[in-house]
Amino acid sequence: VYKVLTVETPEGIVVDGMLQPTQEYADHLVNALGTNGIRTKKVLFTISSTRVASREVQIPNVKASKIEALVKTNASDYFPVDLTQYEIGHYLAGGLAENGKLRVMALAVPKALLNSYYQLAQMCGWEIECFDYSSNSLYQILRDEKSEKVTMVIKIDENSTIVTVLSAGKVLLQRTVAYGVQDAIDTMIASGAYAVNDPMSAVERFQKKTCLN
């Protein structure tokens, strides 16, 4: 990681991972990145959304080049939805199961969700290299942890929380809970106990002070 930048996003631009971009926001985003020396045209989006369905499955221990086709072939067994409205993806969930099969996390991502990112990329003049899912991004960071101890990692996003349980670099359990930091922000503002009236002030407050009773 060479540079990190946080750009405040107006209300309504992102709703549970789905983008509703405006040209004004796209221009603001490009200008903010450029001001901070980030001018690349190739981007990778990491998506966090409760609209994405995920399921751990076990498949025969085939070559890496054949996993995608195998997952897509069996997608209708994993996800009882109209698959014409979804893109199917996957990532390895950490080695082999006890029966010798590969542990794979299969994903079903709404095409409408992906299209909203293509829309933003077009507005910004970017080329999308690929998409990633937040739970996989988290696993890529954690998989080098070789501790034999069972460890729980909790990643809190805006509207959801990812709970990952690992041991020796392997995922034992991963679940997404439909509650995130926005719930805490709304509660802080509504309570009137913390003298905050907007989301950014609420975030700054609970970064500096324990706000749980």
Role assignments for model-derived ranges:
Residues 1-8, 43-46, 142-173, 177-183, ...:
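Gly/Thr-rich phosphate-binding beta-strand-loop-beta motif of the actin/hexokinase/Hsp70
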Residues 1-74, 115, 149:
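Non-catalytic, solvent-exposed interaction/assembly segments
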Residues 16-24, 95-101, 143-149, 196-197:
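Short, glycine- and charge-enriched coil/turn segments that flank and shape catalytic ligand pockets
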Residues 21, 25, 67, 71, ...:
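Helical mechanochemical/support elements of P-loop NTPase systems and associated helical scaffolds
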Residues 30, 118, 185-186:
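Short glycine-/small-residue-rich flexible loop motifs, especially phosphate/cofactor-binding loops
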Residues 32-35, 77-82, 123-124, 191, ...:
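Conserved, well-folded catalytic cores of nucleic-acid-processing
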Residues 42, 46-145:
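Active-site neighborhood for divalent-cation/phosphate handling
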Residues 171-213:
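Phosphate-binding glycine-rich/basic clefts of nucleotide- and phosphate-handling proteins
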